[in-house]
């Protein structure tokens, strides 16, 4: 069922909290792979199916009619994120005049339904649990941090300084190669303004940032 309101979406998400992947997959008649090595997107697909997400692999938000993006957040036994969170691909060409206010990243992060999930690899996939959902909108300070990082990274892209971009740049968000392998190439802007072949780059939220979101929800002060 496709949720028609935020309340319906949150209610559906709360109804699957506490289930294991195996229990939910059996309910939806979806086969469970032995692990995620060849099925990296399986958990996201499972939750999308369970919650009635509409976007599939399109560039819009998962629940575009509600203005909500769905993000799974693998956490360890201590409740800390295990990995960075992909937001969207960076526009490496045709990006002059793009501002934070109308950027794809801001659109994707304007309202997120976070679904924490057990991610420790020693737990068999079928036995990993789904956590309580978090419906999140950036605070003014979080938006400031995201905007600052986005502008700094986009400046490097627009000015043809792709070779200067490293994963260390950015307080809460970073740019990293995004592709199934290093043979995936796209077009970008070179040092002299020429069009070059380069690796696709994606915006990723740092683990410290998503940990802050979890802590705020749990009202636990970070150590």
From Swiss-Prot:
Keywords: Cytoplasm, DNA damage, DNA repair, Endonuclease, Hydrolase, Nuclease. SMART domains: MutH (SM00927). GO terms for biological process: DNA modification; mismatch repair. Transmembrane segments: none annotated. InterPro entries: DNA_mismatch_repair_MutH, DNA_rep_MutH/RE_typeII_Sau3AI, DNA_rep_MutH/T2_RE_sf, Restrct_endonuc-II-like. One of its GO terms (molecular function) is endonuclease activity. It is found in: Cytoplasm. The keyword DNA repair applies. The keyword Iron-sulfur does not apply. GO terms for cellular component: cytoplasm. Sequence-specific endonuclease that cleaves unmethylated GATC sequences. It is involved in DNA mismatch repair. Belongs to the MutH family. This is DNA mismatch repair protein MutH. The lineage of its organism: Bacteria, Pseudomonadati, Pseudomonadota, Gammaproteobacteria, Pasteurellales. The gene is mutH.
